[in-house]
Amino acid sequence: MKKITALMLSSAMMLSLAACGGSASTDAVSSEAVSSEAASSEAVSTAEAAPAALTTVTAGKLTMSTNAAFPPYEMTTDSGEFEGIDIDVAAAIAEKLGLELQVDDMDFDAALLAAQNGKSDIVMAGVTVTDERLKVMDFSDTYAEGIQSIIVPEDSDIASADDLTGKAIGTQRGTTGYIYCTDDFGEDNVIAYDDGLTAVQALNNGQVDAVVIDNAPAQEFVEANPGLKILDTAYAQEDYAIGVAKGNTQLLDAINGALEELKADGTLQAIVDKYINAE
């Protein structure tokens, strides 16, 4: 503003000393100065509004740790590629953030620890928010809902969760299914496997009486294994979220912003519908 005032005073002095022919030149100088200051001010404002670049494990990439044996959320194709709800959601988030998605496949427990210890940026593997997990990592807004289901042989006498008392229960190691079952039925009755498929194979072989796992993969496993069924009564209901290292608010805020956009424009629902048929 001081520059503009000085220029106006200068213009007034020039008008008093010169003929009318000097007026156009003075107006041009004044207009140029105002435009210059406005552009400078706009540049400063834009710089202040621009978000800081995200710091990730690998520059330019969003590294996701997962356990790719959890269909339809994460799985491996015949060609060795990763696909599934979580994979597609993570890819859409990465695109929103201007990053390239990198998927690291490992055991479920290791996937959680990778995000917790900053070895990966995020963990997505049908991860449920629990009080214990909140102590060691932060979570995004919910992006999907899950149900813990019980798989049994078609001729089983197990009709509900109440009938699991004293039975051998197969679960996936480190999952909420494992946590819930050990809390409800004791560790001696719960057998943890590296993935859901191995637990279902144990059920087929008569090594366990039932398997407790998320409903979406449960449906996939039952469809692929004639002679098994899912009980009508759900064991537990829960929400899935994206885990990040404790205190990484910059990344968490960016992820939540991307999720909000994906929900608003219908992308998130389209991804879910791609893998899970609406009933």
PLM-predicted stretches and their roles:
Residues A91, E95, E100-D163, K229, ...:
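Acidic, polar ligand-binding/catalytic clefts
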Residues I87-K96, D155, A168, R173-T175, ...:
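Extended ligand-binding regions for polar small-molecule ligands
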Residues I87-D88, Q102-A114, S156, R173-T176, ...:
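Short helix-initiation/N-cap motifs at beta->coil->alpha
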Residues A68, A144-V152, N215, Q219-E260, ...:
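Periplasmic-binding protein-like
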Residues A49-G126:
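Extracytoplasmic small-molecule ligand-binding "clamshell" domains
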Residues V127-K135, Y180-T182, N204, D209-Q237:
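A ligand-binding cleft/hinge motif common to bilobed small-molecule-binding domains
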Residues L17-V34:
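Bacterial lipoprotein signal-peptidase II cleavage site
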Residues A49-L54, T176-Y193, P226-A234, L259-E279:
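Ligand-binding clefts/hinges and TM-proximal coupling segments of bilobed small-molecule sensing domains
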